[in-house]
Amino acid sequence: MKPYISIVIPTLNEQDNMHKLLEGIHSVIKDYRYEVIIVDGHSRDHTVKFARQMGATVIYDDKGKGSALRKGLAAAKGKIIISMDADLSHRPNELKLLIAGIEAGYDVCMGSRFLTGGGSDDMPLTRIIGNKIFVAIVNILYGSHYTDMCYGYRSFARGVSRKLSLEEDGFGIETEISIKAQKKHLRALEVPSYEKLRASGEGKLRSLGDGAIILRTILKNL
């Protein structure tokens, strides 16, 4: 029997992306039993209405991406739990690759834009350099071999989020997951992922401020 899948998606004012995203998810994993959990930061548009119309479960958290992800992971019922963004930058056709990584026995499976077959339409030079610097620092300090650090398209075996004891409320959450997976000797796999441009709406990432948050996350977990 195929595993039950939970997909956790933090949202804030993503109404224009909801239908295409949820239709894309369904088209790829319609042969699985699955749930979609929208963790909404009190959107001012019709994100919640559209998500519910498409059959998603909606819960609320407005403390930041990390807090929303932690709340969604805690609510998920699936044997395999997947985190993805709402802006269509994460391609639904890669879902089965993330599922396969957990089915193969890994605890965490992480999309990487820097493996062969991966890439990005939305990574200016400053972000490329920043990501590579953060990856190098983490690999040196923690003895890991990651290629990507700040990318949220990931899958988890059930129970892994409790083992990780995540604390980050903001954009440091992906870095915290990577570091704690290494520190707790979890089996982690990177798979190629191609990041598309945000389809609609306003991005929430702020390179300088969020870079400082990521650096703080790296250092505080030493």
Role assignments for model-derived ranges:
Residues M1-G24:
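N-proximal low-complexity "stem/linker" segments adjacent to membrane-targeting elements
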Residues Y4-S6, E35, E176:
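Cell-envelope/extracellular polymer assembly enzymes that use nucleotide-activated donors
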Residues E23-R33:
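Short, acidic, metal-binding catalytic loop of nucleotide-sugar glycosyltransferases
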Residues D40-V48:
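A conserved acidic beta->alpha catalytic loop
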Residues D61-K63, S67-A75, P92-F171, K196-L219:
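Acceptor/aglycone-binding surface of glycosyltransferases and processive sugar-polymer synthases
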Residues I81:
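Short aromatic/hydrophobic "clamp" motif used to bind/position activated sugar donors
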Residues D85-S89:
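The conserved acidic donor/metal-binding loop of glycosyltransferases
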Residues V160-L164, G170-R187:
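A short, conserved alpha-helix in the catalytic core of glycosyltransferases
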